[in-house]
Amino acid sequence: RASKNKNEPLFILLHGAGAMGSDNLKQLFDNLPLYKQLIKTDCNILLPQAPFGSNRGEAMQNYIKSIKRLADKLPIDFDRKRIYIIGTSFGGCCVWQLIYLFPEYFAAAVPVMGSLCPDHRYEKYDFRRLVKTPIWAAHSSDDTNVRIDSDDYCAAELEKLGADIKY
């Protein structure tokens, strides 16, 4: 949805794995409560749908990079210094990856039930890359799909570095 006004922010909403597909509908329902709130404000909203099978390995990396390419090529006039990214579960994992790969691209990030390190190999990440992006992360302690310990670790590391993180 494009704003009627120029230079408004862009919100990118990323869905969970259950909304993968090619119908361009499932991701709308996955983010419906947030979408309903955002359409009351003057902003631009992008809800890309991940194709089936894009939640692992190279396919996931291709999807993640395609989100940024899509935002870069949007044919609307929006404030490129106010790009906010929000995702749940699989989408939360994508949020962590996007802000890691493109650390100064997003104005702020909200990964919900996501994981930067699903393989728990934290040593391969330089957490200093994430310090400049304000993050509000949330995770349920009884999540059975995405383990909370990755968010626990990431939040602790970022707090040590003085990052702007709420968890």
Regions found by a protein language model. Give the residues of each.
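Short, solvent-exposed loop/turn and secondary-structure capping segments
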Residues: 21-26, 57-58, 97-98, 121-122, ...
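Primarily recognizes the serine-hydrolase "nucleophile elbow" in alpha/beta-hydrolase
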Residues: 81-129
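Gly/Ser-rich "nucleophile elbow"/oxyanion-hole loop immediately N-terminal to the catalytic nucleophile
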Residues: 55-89
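Active-site machinery of serine-nucleophile hydrolases
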Residues: 10, 14-65
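Proline/glycine-enriched tight loop/beta-turn segments at coil->beta junctions
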Residues: 2-10, 130-131
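Cell-envelope and extracellular/periplasmic
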Residues: 14-21, 72, 88-90, 95, ...
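The feature captures the conserved acid-bearing segment of alpha/beta-hydrolase catalytic domains
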Residues: 108-167
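Alpha/beta-hydrolase fold active-site loops
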Residues: 9, 43, 82, 107, ...
